[in-house]
């Protein structure tokens, strides 16, 4: 009876070990914060700070950001620049605004002087070690000042 129980215990342990999810497949989206917005004559730069809560690094191939100022949607920013987030680390990333988004942001900031709440909804395309793509979504906020 003992060998039977031992073989059942070993089999169960192997099955449970084989069913565990690798750390990379249990990814949390990074925490994000808007740290700056600078706009001028049809140009602009949005600065975001990302904090990776995962025990594995994140390789973001590309990202899409939707910018809102106050309660107004300003526009969508597609960013093809890669972002490397070290495990449990932080990175500051700057995103160049398309001309239409920069113009809309500048018009909003001129009409609303002082500090304005900026909200950015980001979709981050992470490439896993197996070359799969996982979309991580996060929302960041911060106060920005009119020029």
What is the meaning of each model-derived region?
Residues 44-46, 63-65, 93-95, 116-122:
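Hydrophobic residues positioned within well-ordered beta-strands of beta-sheet architectures
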Residues 1-19:
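Sec-dependent bacterial lipoprotein signal peptides
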Residues 30-35, 48, 77-81, 104-106:
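Short structured motifs
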Residues 101-147:
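Terminal connector regions
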Residues 69-105:
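Intrinsically disordered, low-complexity Pro/Gly/Ser/Thr-rich segments with frequent PxxP/GP/PP motifs
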Residues 15-36:
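Bacterial Sec signal peptide processing site at the extreme N-terminus
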Residues 35-76, 126-136:
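Post-signal-peptide N-terminal segment of Sec-exported extracytoplasmic proteins
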Residues 26, 42, 59-61, 89, ...:
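Residue-level preference for beta-strand/loop junctions
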């Amino acid at each position: 009876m003992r060998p039977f129980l031992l073989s059942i215990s070993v089999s169960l342990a192997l099955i449970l070990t084989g069913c565990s999810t690798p750390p990379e497949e249990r990814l949390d989206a990074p925490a994000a914060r808007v740290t700056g917005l600078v706009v001028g004559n049809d140009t602009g730069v949005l600065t975001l700070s990302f904090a990776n809560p995962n025990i594995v690094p994140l390789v973001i191939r590309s990202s899409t950001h939707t910018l809102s100022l106050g309660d107004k949607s300003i526009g969508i920013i597609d960013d093809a620049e890669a972002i490397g987030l070290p495990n449990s680390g932080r990175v500051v990333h700057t995103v160049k605004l398309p001309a239409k988004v920069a113009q809309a942001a500048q018009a909003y900031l001129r009409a609303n002087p002082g500090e304005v709440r900026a909200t950015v909804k980001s979709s981050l395309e992470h490439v896993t070690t197996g070359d799969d793509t996982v979309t991580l979504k996060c929302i960041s906020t911060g106060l920005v000042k009119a020029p």
